[in-house]
Design a protein with these regions (language model features):
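The feature marks proteins involved in alpha-glucan
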Residues: 16-34, 63-67, 71-151, 187, ...
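Short, surface-exposed alpha-helix to beta-strand junction/turn motifs within ectodomains of secreted
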Residues: 37-47, 160-179, 258-280
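C-terminal beta-strand-rich structural cap/linker in extracellular carbohydrate-active enzymes
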Residues: 302-304, 867-893
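Conserved alpha/beta catalytic core and glycan-binding cleft of carbohydrate-active enzymes
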Residues: 334-341, 575-576, 580, 584-738, ...
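Substrate-binding/active-site clefts of carbohydrate-active enzymes
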Residues: 370-553, 566-582, 586, 598
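Glycan-recognition and catalytic regions of carbohydrate-active enzymes
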Residues: 668, 727, 731-744, 761, ...
Length: 922
């Protein structure tokens, strides 16, 4: 009998043995039982791609247990094998709302009882539990969900359960206040007998049946008030760590914090990454004016690393300074920088290329740091591949064809716009030498900002040493300047890479971001949050940051990502600050956003309000889609594919005249049916950029079988239109030799933001192919021609209206125009540009006593005349060909002379024409 009992016991004991984790059970509790309103889970393996996980259902009915709903995850799937952490976010719909805004990670042990790991979550609670009785787990009892001032004497609150007004009480620095409370179900408002005092702490207490709960009242609802700005709007220029010869001064804006401690480290590397968490010293900071905290050291602390430990209410946390100017690995700790000790030899402040008078003189080339040098055919030093220093290596070739920096110089552009090179935090800088990570994970466009004023560590030779990234980036700007190329910075102030756990939000919750009426992060960026540029200290940060980059690194321009999420006043403030440094600094951006936003349309820095920003340019999606077709429909063609619809023609013409209100131009198909750019200096004309398909891939996807033989001609014509248009031309790196982005899974990659180098790299071996070299030489000639002839670079709407005329408008498939009157002091009297998108045809040239000199056709372009035609003569135009002719010639003076405030100096630009340069003010 005893033996039989033992047999019965054995299976039970065996079942309790731990086994490898194969299943994850996620238990989730919501107070309102509103799971059916679209709640789901976003789950991802650490450093891997995420995906939606739905809660379990049985015959379309949600499965519930004693805790709440349940989601089952199979951890034997390939993406979850051999991982130690899984990221988790509870969300409603496709990011309509998030429960807990920051990322949390489930720790996956190697084994667990029964092979199934259970994890428990509660709405609004940051904690997670690994059992229902886990002492470190979440609390399911009722609580206060939110309480914040909406006026100086009024608080709005939300509870998990209904309470009577008598169950609520408000305290000011521990003293009970006299209030009037109006309760409606689980929400209500509290009216104070007097206005609140920003220097005091307010706490709401609620007596639930499960016990007394407290909540620190926040200022979220009055951040936009004049009273808050007057109390805490700091206008000093000393935020961050400022190093002098024998001292270092720290100042942090943290107006609601009760204490701030400065932590000094000898290393920027935490123990988790092989460094140390031992603090060399800590200092209690002193609360000072306008919500700032300060500490002064009598030492030059250059090379040390620092963080702040901040207490807000019941929460204490350590974070990096938003004003940090360099950092250790992965941007976790800021670095104290004495820039006098990091400048490369010969570096000179306020030294930029003096290569433009007006924005229309610029030719912008958009490039990613890694793309230039990632492929083996670059043939530069291996240690510089994908790094800042690789951008400026000279003498690199592939089969006698220039690569890298020499290619850029040979092309002849005036400015390079680099995709984000601030510290974007997505790339794990501790894994840069891991071959697996190099193959899949090391690449990112960089649009998820971590530290706005810190150069990206993965682009430096040593991300563990914060001085390297500073010195090496300055070497880049210095080398560019010496080669007469301005460096434009792609800036992403419209959102932060992290939301609730970003350093901005940890320091002052809810201030730097716009929130929805429910208190969630608004998502106008499409990345989880958006910043509130209209607030005083956010605006100040943006101005301070751009001024810092312009002055410390000699940046020549700024491209604003999703600029419509910013407000007009902030953009104009940035312009004022930057133009005071150098009047030729370029400022432009994307006049759209990435989702719905609470920002008032009346103040958004978008197309409608561009007229209120006289020195801010904007990308011209009208000409982009007119030339090649919509970026949102791969198969849709535009002008170069043979399109003749009025909207195609008119959108292309709109770009040709530089986005101005040109007489006779039909604006029906232009945004808001208006010439919204207002001036050619504000019109960034382009056909392709890092977003969407490359031009070559778009042409492959949008042409018929019969048309594919003309793709190289279309590739040339697309930017022949851009480079002969009024406005500011913008080229995507590699477009000049038919760059493609072949997707890993086949086809073409239209969104390669985290695709591997194999997708994004510039293939110099392909440039060397004959057909691609012919396209490259054509682009090089176009650029030289534009630089030599100011008629293509008029700066005002009136100049364009006075000198440009469209011709051959009765000819289908033709867009043609003349630029007359020796426009903008050109040497050519009248220039005729003809774009033919269809079949071979013949045209009668305009009459005139002087002949027409053909200088560009589908294969040749330059200053030398290919053929001369009589006025009124017949000219043949091939399929998908652009012709450029001129009539009349007037040489410019060969001696320096003053003409309208400019110096006219003949220059040999690849053997072409002259360039009009303005003397820099000293």
């Amino acid at each position: 009998m005893i033996f039989l009992l033992l047999l019965l016991v054995v299976p039970v004991s065996l079942a309790a043995v731990e086994s490898p984790v194969s299943t994850l059970k996620i238990h989730y509790y919501r107070y309102g039982d509103d799971y059916q309103t679209g709640w789901n889970i976003w789950l991802w393996p650490l450093a891997g791609a995420g995906g939606q996980v739905d809660f379990d259902k049985n015959e379309n009915v949600l499965v519930k247990d004693d805790w709440g709903v349940v989601a089952t995850v199979d951890l034997t799937e390939a993406k979850f094998t051999n991982i130690s952490q899984i990221g988790i976010i509870f969300r409603r719909g496709a990011w309509a709302e998030k429960d807990i805004d920051f990322d949390r990670f489930i720790q996956i042990p190697e084994t667990v009882e029964g092979g199934t790991l259970h994890v428990y979550f509660v709405e609004g609670d940051e904690k997670m539990g690994y059992s229902t009785t886990d002492p470190n787990g979440p609390d399911r009892s009722d609580k206060i969900k939110s309480a914040f001032f909406t006026k100086a004497n009024e608080i709005a609150y939300r509870l998990t359960a209904s309470l009577a007004a008598s169950d609520l009480s408000l305290y000011e620095d521990g003293t009970l206040l006299s209030t009037t409370i109006t309760a409606t179900n689980n929400t209500g408002k509290i009216v104070l007998a007097k206005d609140m005092d920003f220097s005091k702490k307010y706490q709401l207490k609620a007596q639930f049946s499960s016990g007394l709960k407290t909540y620190d009242v926040t200022f979220d609802g009055i951040y936009d008030s004049e009273a808050f700005e007057q109390a805490f709007g700091y206008d000093g220029n000393d935020l961050g760590a400022i190093v002098n010869n024998s001292s270092t001064n720290f100042r942090l804006w943290a107006p609601i914090s009760s204490s701030v401690t400065l932590n000094i480290y000898d290393t920027g590397t935490p123990a988790s990454l092989g460094g140390s968490d031992t603090k060399a010293s800590t200092y209690t900071m002193i609360k000072d004016v306008k919500g700032t905290w300060k500490y002064s050291s009598n030492q030059n602390l250059h090379g040390k690393y620092y963080t702040y430990t901040i207490t807000n209410g019941a929460r204490t946390f350590e974070t990096i300074d938003p004003y940090a100017k360099s950092a250790g690995v992965n941007g976790i700790r800021g670095m104290i920088v004495d820039f006098a000790q990091t400048n490369p030899d010969g570096f000179t402040y306020n030294h930029r290329p003096d290569n433009i008078v007006n924005a229309t003189d610029a030719i912008i080339y958009e490039l990613h740091v890694r793309d230039l040098t990632a492929h083996s055919s670059w043939n530069g030093p291996a240690e510089h591949r994908g790094k800042f220093l690789g951008l400026i290596d000279e003498g690199t070739t592939y089969e006698d064809v220039t690569t890298g920096f020499d290619h850029i110089k040979e092309l002849g552009i005036t400015h390079v716009q680099l995709l984000p090179f601030f510290d974007f935090g997505v790339v794990d800088e501790s894994k840069l030498n891991d071959p697996k990570y190099q193959a899949n994970g090391i690449f990112n466009w960089g649009y998820m900002p971590l530290n706005f004023n810190v150069p990206e560590g993965s682009y430096s030779s040593n991300p563990y040493d914060g001085t390297k990234r500073v010195t090496e980036l300055k070497q880049v700007t210095d080398a560019f300047t010496k080669n007469d190329i301005g460096l434009i910075m792609d800036v992403v102030y419209n959102h932060t890479g992290l939301s609730a756990d970003s350093n901005f939000n940890l320091i002052i919750p809810g201030y730097f971001h716009r929130l929805t009426p429910t208190g969630a992060f608004s998502n106008g960026s499409g990345t989880g949050n958006e910043t509130a540029s209209e607030r005083y200290m956010v605006r100040k940060f943006m101005v301070d940051s751009t001024v810092f980059w312009a002055t410390e690194y000699n940046i020549s321009g700024f491209r604003f990502d999703l600029m419509a999420l910013h407000d007009v006043e902030t953009m104009n403030a940035i312009v004022t600050a930057l133009k005071a440094i150098d009047e030729n600094i370029l400022i432009y951006g994307e006049p759209w956003n990435g989702g719905s936003t609470p920002l008032s349309p009346s103040i958004a820095a978008d197309k409608v309000n561009l007229e209120d920003m006289p020195n801010v340019g904007a990308f011209n999606d009208e000409i982009r889609d007119g030339i090649k077709g919509s970026v949102f429909t791969a198969a849709e063609g535009g002008f170069v594919q043979g399109g003749t619809l009025p909207k195609i023609i008119n959108r292309t013409k709109y770009g040709i005249v530089g986005g101005v209100a040109f007489p006779g131009l039909d604006l029906t198909d232009i945004s808001y049916q208006t010439a919204w750019h207002t001036a050619p200096t504000k019109t960034i004309n382009y056909v392709s950029a890092h977003d969407n398909n490359t031009l070559y891939d778009k042409l492959k996807l949008s042409t018929t079988y019969a048309q594919k033989q003309y793709i190289d001609e279309m590739q040339k014509q697309a930017n022949a239109i851009v480079l002969t248009s009024q406005g500011v031309p913008f080229l995507h790196a590699g477009v000049e030799f038919m760059r493609s982005k072949p997707a890993v899974s086949g086809g073409y990659d239209h969104n390669s933001y985290e695709s591997p180098d194999s997708v994004n790299q510039l293939r110099w071996d392909l440039k060397a192919e004959e057909i691609n070299m012919s396209v490259f030489n054509y682009y090089k000639g176009l650029i030289a021609l534009r630089k030599a002839h100011p008629a293509f670079r008029m700066a005002t709407a009136q100049e364009v209206i006075d000198n440009v005329d469209f011709v051959y408008e009765d000819k289908q498939g033709i867009i043609a125009y003349t630029i007359s009157n020796y426009a903008n002091n050109d040497t050519w009297g009248t220039i005729l540009v003809i774009h033919n998108n269809g079949n071979f045809l013949q045209l009668k040239l305009p009459e005139g006593e002087e002949g027409w000199n053909l200088v560009a056709n589908g294969t040749k372009i330059g200053e030398e005349t290919i053929k001369t035609y009589l006025g009124g003569g017949i000219i043949s135009v091939l399929e998908h060909e652009t012709l450029i002719l001129y009539q009349g010639y007037k040489p410019l003076p060969t001696k320096r002379g003053c003409f309208g405030g400019t110096s006219i100096i003949p220059l040999a630009i690849l053997g072409l024409g002259v360039l009009v340069l303005k003397k820099r003010k000293h």
